[in-house]
């Protein structure tokens, strides 16, 4: 409907419209759902949080046009977060595939700075996320919660990587959610080399932001891409997230950012009466 219209013409589309988008889907993987809400005007933080709570998905993304860019905020059912990869990819999907916003680059104003996204080849969408710098830590910091580990790393201020033996060990992890609160990180990323058709496989636990286990975690690539490059020298990476829904992600590492790519689809759209 909106294909071919300039950004300046999109104001007629604005209302509290929403789309449920599955991000980072694969052939059998259902990806991570995000609800993208297109706001016609700013809303109070408490109202945004209540909407996210009512919708109940791992993240709700709130989009609002600001000049030629887009304000983007992410809320779990319990808190606003500083960065969310899959909900950013979902927001990009809505702008490009539902609203037909033209242009090669889409820019989002976020709590993590200005992020950009674009359409890639082979049905992929790509977003640029800030690169994290990875430092080794003592495995005992995580082993009490996750069991025996090969390596452990701090990734930026809010993530840790726990390297397990193999894919079977990863899938067999049984984690006590309460014990994860003892780890001083928002994201606890368990990772192993290999997995069906990919370079590495992961599971991600985030109870501090209200997610016992995240279905697919685009922001984890901020740490995984540089960790893989340090390990192998390869700037590209393919990842399978071994959650119940499952997901597939791709990345390319640059000096200051990580381009994270995946496939998206709209599950349904509607109106938010708020």
Regions found by a protein language model. Give the residues of each.
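Active-site proximal loop and beta-alpha junction motif in alpha/beta enzyme cores
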Residues: 2-83, 89-274
């Amino acid at each position: 409907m909106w294909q071919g219209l300039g950004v300046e013409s999109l104001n007629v589309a604005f209302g509290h419209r929403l789309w449920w988008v599955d991000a980072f889907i694969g052939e059998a993987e259902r990806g991570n759902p995000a609800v993208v809400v297109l706001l016609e005007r700013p809303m109070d933080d408490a109202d945004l949080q209540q909407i996210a709570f009512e919708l109940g998905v791992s993240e709700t993304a709130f989009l609002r046009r600001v000049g030629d860019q887009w304000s983007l905020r992410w809320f779990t059912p319990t808190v606003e977060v500083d960065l969310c990869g899959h909900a950013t990819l979902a927001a990009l999907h809505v702008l490009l595939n539902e609203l037909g916003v033209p242009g090669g680059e889409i820019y989002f104003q976020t709590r993590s700075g200005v992020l950009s996204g674009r359409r890639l080849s082979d049905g992929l969408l790509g977003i640029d996320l800030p690169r994290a710098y990875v430092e080794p830590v003592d495995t005992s910091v995580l082993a009490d919660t996750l069991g025996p580990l090969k390596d452990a790393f701090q990734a930026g201020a809010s993530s840790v990587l726990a390297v397990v033996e193999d894919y079977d060990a990863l899938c067999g992890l049984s984690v006590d959610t309460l014990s994860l609160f003892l780890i001083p990180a928002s994201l606890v990323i368990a990772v192993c080399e290999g997995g069906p058709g990919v370079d590495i496989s992961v599971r991600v636990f985030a109870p501090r932001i209200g997610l016992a286990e995240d279905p697919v975690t685009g922001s984890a690539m901020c740490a995984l891409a540089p960790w893989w490059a340090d390990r192998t020298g390869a700037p590209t990476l393919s990842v399978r997230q071994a959650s119940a829904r499952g997901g597939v992600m791709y990345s390319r590492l640059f000096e200051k950012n990580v381009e994270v790519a995946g496939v998206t689809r709209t599950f349904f759209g509607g109106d938010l009466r708020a």
